[in-house]
């Protein structure tokens, strides 16, 4: 069990360091550096031990920094993946509809998603 935790911790540290090398916003980098320095292994593992999964209900999770949390970068990866699929499946005249609600960051994530679709030449309606 201790070996499993150590393996997860090392894997999580490596993923966190990879994120620090990406061109991400400074507030995300600050949070990652805090996670690495504060020694809270549980938080570091929870944030970075795996990639957020896309299930039948879409992406579900806790908002925060890391590959296993909901944030603009994990939303962006899922959106780019969906864009790639749509362009293969439909090839032209693709359009999407994005709805947001009153939940935390819902509007921001919707607008970020719309920008990614737009960059992929996918017509997007946001409401």
Where in the sequence are the language-model features?
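An N-terminal, well-structured beta->alpha segment
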Residues: 9-113
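A structural preference for short, hydrophobic beta-strand core positions in alpha/beta folds
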Residues: 126-127
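Charged/polar low-complexity intrinsically disordered segments, enriched in acidic residues
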Residues: 2-5
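Short helix-loop-beta junction
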Residues: 111-123
